[in-house]
Design a protein with these regions (language model features):
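Extreme N-terminal segment that seeds HTH/winged-HTH DNA-binding domains in transcriptional regulators
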Residues: 1-12, 16
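Flexible loop/hinge segments that line or gate small-molecule binding clefts
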Residues: 127-169, 214, 253, 279-291
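Flexible loop/turn connectors
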Residues: 231-341
Length: 341
């Protein structure tokens, strides 16, 4: 019986589509994976069939992977700016890009696997990084070329990623509040499973320790989605006798939610509570008062992600690069010294 592509895939521990793309010397497959697959092909005596080949377009395609919308609390203009940066760079280099999303990780993964099986993408850009991510694990285990926007949660040395120094940004944001006179500074963010939020929280804690303040977990409110029952926890924190006079918030959209919640409680921003947020998205400018926010330059994150993806498609033997994009604080109207200062 003739050896099939499925036999090779099973022996090599990869998918049939990976074997197919190895036969075509696709740059989206890592050198190590290609060598392993070719070794198994030789051992089994597999002969690829090139009689039916898809017509390749001159343009190559990059898949842009968004977070699953069911779990995401920070999907907003931030991602649109990243995609705008990716699109701008891809247009300059005559690459096509396509957006991949779904209601949960399984749906996103299914869409990616379908693209891979049909050889519809030469590389992927993952717009988020979280712990125990099945999408990142699939891309890594299949040896597929991918770039992560955010710090890699696993195999960081072998992963191409573009990020900000989120710990430093969190520290500088908390420093700003401390220098304004605040000593009771709280934190409101998304789950620590999202690495950007975990790093910003770590920076916030580093700032407090640097200034001789012991961080308290009861001063940190973290949620997975806006549907979480967080309001009672937030209310208890903001109405306590020793309530915080300032709060660091991991994202602009959560900061808008916080402003609205303060209004319900009869608290005024910034007189009763100063707020520093992140991303400098449209939300930070259309709310009242406008948010003091850390600009993490999402457009440049997108440009760099596209640049590295294309660079590695065209030069598959390059080592995994890591690029840190700078940040800067944008002071606006949501901060002032605490009442006692």
């Amino acid at each position: 019986m003739a050896v099939t592509i499925k036999d090779v895939a099973a022996a090599a521990g990869v998918s049939p589509s990976t074997v197919s793309r190895t036969c075509k010397d696709s740059p989206s497959i890592s050198r190590d994976t290609k060598e392993r697959v070719r070794r198994i092909m030789a051992q089994l005596g597999y002969e690829p069939n090139f009689e039916v080949e898809p017509v390749e377009a001159f343009s190559k395609t990059i898949g842009i992977i968004l977070p699953s919308s069911q779990r995401d609390v920070y999907e907003n203009a931030f991602h649109l700016e990243i995609i705008r940066g990716i699109g701008q760079f891809c247009n300059q280099r005559r690459y096509v890009n396509t957006v991949i999303t779904g209601q949960d990780d399984a749906e996103v993964l299914d869409a990616i696997q379908s693209m891979v099986a049909n050889a519809q993408a030469d590389g992927f850009i993952l717009l988020y990084s979280k712990k125990d991510c099945p999408v990142a694990a699939y891309l890594r285990n299949e040896g597929l070329l991918h770039v992560i926007v955010g710090k890699a949660a696993q195999s960081a040395n072998q992963t191409i990623y573009i990020d900000n120094d989120n710990a430093l940004a969190g520290e500088e944001a908390a420093d700003y509040l401390y220098e304004m006179g605040h000593r009771r500074i709280a934190y409101f963010g998304v789950s620590n499973a999202m690495l950007f939020s975990a790093e910003r929280k770590r920076g916030y804690q580093m700032s407090l320790l640097k200034h001789g303040i012991t961080p308290r977990e009861e001063d940190c409110v973290e949620i997975d989605t806006l549907n979480d029952a967080y309001e009672e926890t937030l209310k208890a924190l903001l109405t306590a006798p020793d309530r915080p006079t300032a709060m660091l918030v991991s994202d602009d959209i959560l900061a808008v939610v916080l402003e609205q919640f303060c209004d319900k409680l009869g608290l005024h921003v910034p007189k009763d509570l100063s707020i520093v947020s992140f991303n400098n998205s449209l939300f930070s400018r259309i709310t009242s008062p406008q948010l003091t926010t850390m600009d993490v330059n999402p457009y440049q994150l997108g440009m760099e992600a596209a640049s590295q993806t294309i660079n590695h498609i065209e030069n598959p033997n390059l080592l995994a690069t890591k690029i840190i994009v700078p940040h800067r604080l944008i002071p606006r109207e949501s901060c002032c010294p605490p009442p006692e200062v």
